[in-house]
Amino acid sequence: MPIGVPRVRFLYDEDTGQVWIDIYNRLYRERCLFLTHTINTKIGNQLAGLFIYLGIQDDPKDIFFFLNSPGGGIISGLAIYDSMQVVRPDTQTICVGLAASMACFLLVGGTITKRLAFPHARVMMHQPLSTFFETQTGDAVMEVDELLKMRENLIEVYAQRTGKPHWVISEDIERDVFLSPTEAKTYGLVDVVGVTLI
């Protein structure tokens, strides 16, 4: 029998009083966002929208972005990343399980000094992937060209946010690189290893 999503009480306003809402909506209202699935267009749009919504509120408190994801689509991931960068409040990124591929990119995209990995988390970075074995030759060439542009874009951001030279990032992402939280801190992907939010 599925457990479902628990509902909790929330004081909506003085007129309405308390209402029951699911726990994720309650946490969103406390400025806590979660990425716990593969990144796709739907997830990307939802998270980008939530970042923008929280960013336009008149509240300077940090946004907490919890990551436990195998990664996913580049375009949707970049939409989330760009939304994180344009909002006024700082974004604390927290890896609670696995931040792989595009989720690693989002982890490094948090406000510098406010990127955290829990002690038993894992971080994995690699170059963008694509499958073009079923496309026509012309389409495959265009896709490869676009993929190379995205790869350079990702390398640029990783280099800026980790302090590593471009060539180091380029060589390292040639294969899957799994890092412990301590290794991720040494690399510059996170700033803190622990369980206390900054």
Curated annotation (Swiss-Prot):
Subcellular location per the Swiss-Prot or TrEMBL entry: Plastid
Top-level class of the enzyme under EC nomenclature: hydrolase
Reactions listed under catalytic activity: Hydrolysis of proteins to small peptides in the presence of ATP and magnesium. alpha-casein is the usual test substrate. In the absence of ATP, only oligopeptides shorter than five residues are hydrolyzed (such as succinyl-Leu-Tyr-|-NHMec, and Leu-Tyr-Leu-|-Tyr-Trp, in which cleavage of the -Tyr-|-Leu- and -Tyr-|-Trp bonds also occurs)
GO terms, biological process: protein quality control for misfolded or incompletely synthesized proteins
EC number in record: 3.4.21.92
Assigned keywords, A-Z: Hydrolase, Plastid, Protease, Serine protease
GO cellular component: endopeptidase Clp complex; plastid stroma
Catalytic center residues: S101, H126
Function: Cleaves peptides in various proteins in a process that requires ATP hydrolysis. Has a chymotrypsin-like activity. Plays a major role in the degradation of misfolded proteins.
Self-association and partners: Component of the plastid Clp protease core complex.
Name this polypeptide is given: ATP-dependent Clp protease proteolytic subunit
Species per Swiss-Prot/TrEMBL record: Cuscuta gronovii
